[in-house]
């Protein structure tokens, strides 16, 4: 996993309010980060944070009530040896959860070794879940793509195409028909799971849509709160093409896909021409995609009916010759 620039300080700043973290020792270790080799070999955020585990000392160590009770039961020599081994390998930081008080000798050792030590009243399980989700998000593959990203009938749809084809105008018409804007011009996509890509708007462009001749429109102010969305999963790409595009297929026999962060996203191409109602065509494409996700493929059904009709015709012709 890629965790360049992620330090104890940045993790604390991003999560202190959510899980009520307090920094009690090791302030000099603010720049401490994950071991580079360990982070590279980690396959998921579950490898990066967990309950106290001396077998995996390089990860974030969370100590709840059971771990603190175990620690306090150890004799002085064993406690000193085990914590010495843990601190020596420089974990990013330690968290004392469940509202437990940090043992004085552990706090002193963290201070001397500049190992950040946090405390929180939140349960250890909740701390681990929160930090795993946080690390998954910041380390996930991401890309910024050009287009208009909309919520159409509950489906995340990215409208793409060359400059000047009317993507923003089409987006504005779809918004006026009751659909929602996620982002215009630049869309930040992040892959959060094996089949899950989430799209968001960069903070600078939040709620804004740029239309030639009108300038920047604040969609939230003009159309209301329900006209904008914070995020959506991308399920469909609509590619606008010029009428003279030689690669356009009127009736594509094979499904078309666009690779987004290694995940194939279903794509449809729509020709832009005078008199065509693009908003209706996009809505129809979305409805058709919903049917495809339910296992209903209209084109395949038509081809099957056509094939059956041709076979029946061939059989009747053969019988006619025999007569």
Swiss-Prot record:
Residues 209-218 are annotated as: Important for the catalytic mechanism of both phosphorylation and dephosphorylation. It comes from the Bacteria. ATP binds at residues 161-168. It catalyses: [HPr protein]-L-serine + ATP = [HPr protein]-O-phospho-L-serine + ADP + H(+); [HPr protein]-O-phospho-L-serine + phosphate + H(+) = [HPr protein]-L-serine + diphosphate. Keywords: ATP-binding, Kinase, Magnesium, Metal-binding, Multifunctional enzyme, Nucleotide-binding, Serine/threonine-protein kinase, Transferase. Its EC number is 2.7.11.-, 2.7.4.-. It is an enzyme of class 2 (transferase). One of its GO terms (biological process) is regulation of carbohydrate metabolic process. One of its GO terms (molecular function) is magnesium ion binding. Residues 271-276 are annotated as: Important for the catalytic mechanism of dephosphorylation. HAMAP family: HPr_kinase (MF_01249). Belongs to the HPrK/P family. The Walker A ATP-binding motif also binds Pi and PPi. Catalyzes the ATP- as well as the pyrophosphate-dependent phosphorylation of a specific serine residue in HPr, a phosphocarrier protein of the phosphoenolpyruvate-dependent sugar phosphotransferase system (PTS). HprK/P also catalyzes the pyrophosphate-producing, inorganic phosphate-dependent dephosphorylation (phosphorolysis) of seryl-phosphorylated HPr (P-Ser-HPr). Both phosphorylation and phosphorolysis are carried out by the same active site and suggest a common mechanism for both reactions. This is HPr kinase/phosphorylase. It comes from Cupriavidus necator (strain ATCC 17699 / DSM 428 / KCTC 22496 / NCIMB 10442 / H16 / Stanier 337). The gene is hprK.
């Amino acid at each position: 996993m890629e965790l360049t620039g992620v330090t104890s300080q940045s993790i604390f700043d991003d999560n202190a309010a959510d899980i009520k973290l307090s920094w009690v020792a090791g302030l000099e270790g603010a720049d401490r980060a994950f071991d580079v080799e360990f982070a590279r070999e980690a396959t998921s955020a579950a490898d990066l944070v967990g309950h106290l585990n001396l077998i995996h000392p390089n990860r974030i160590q969370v100590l709840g009530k059971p771990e603190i009770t175990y620690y306090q039961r150890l004799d002085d020599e064993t406690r000193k040896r085990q914590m010495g081994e843990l601190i020596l390998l420089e974990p990013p930081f330690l968290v004392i959860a469940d509202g437990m008080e940090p043992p004085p000798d552990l706090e002193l050792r963290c201070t001397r070794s500049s190992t950040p030590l946090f405390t929180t009243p939140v349960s250890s399980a909740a701390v681990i879940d929160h930090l795993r989700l946080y690390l998954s998000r910041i380390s996930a593959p991401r890309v910024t793509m050009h287009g208009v990203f909309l919520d159409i009938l509950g489906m995340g749809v990215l409208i793409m195409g060359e400059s000047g084809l009317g993507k923003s105008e089409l987006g504005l018409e779809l918004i006026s028909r009751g659909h929602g804007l996620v982002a215009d011009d630049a869309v930040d996509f992040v892959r959060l799971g094996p089949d899950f890509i989430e799209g968001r708007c960069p903070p600078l462009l939040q709620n804004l849509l740029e239309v030639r001749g009108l300038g920047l429109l604040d969609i939230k102010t003009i159309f209301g709160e329900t006209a904008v969305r914070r995020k959506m999963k991308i399920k469909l790409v609509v590619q606008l093409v010029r009428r003279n595009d030689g690669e356009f297929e009127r009736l594509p026999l094979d499904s078309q896909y666009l690779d987004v962060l290694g995940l194939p996203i279903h794509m449809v191409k729509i020709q832009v021409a005078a008199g065509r109602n693009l908003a209706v065509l996009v809505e129809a494409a979305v409805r058709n995609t919903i049917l495809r996700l339910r296992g209903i493929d209209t084109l395949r059904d038509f081809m099957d009916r056509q094939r059956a009709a041709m076979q029946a015709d061939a059989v009747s012709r053969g019988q006619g010759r025999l007569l």
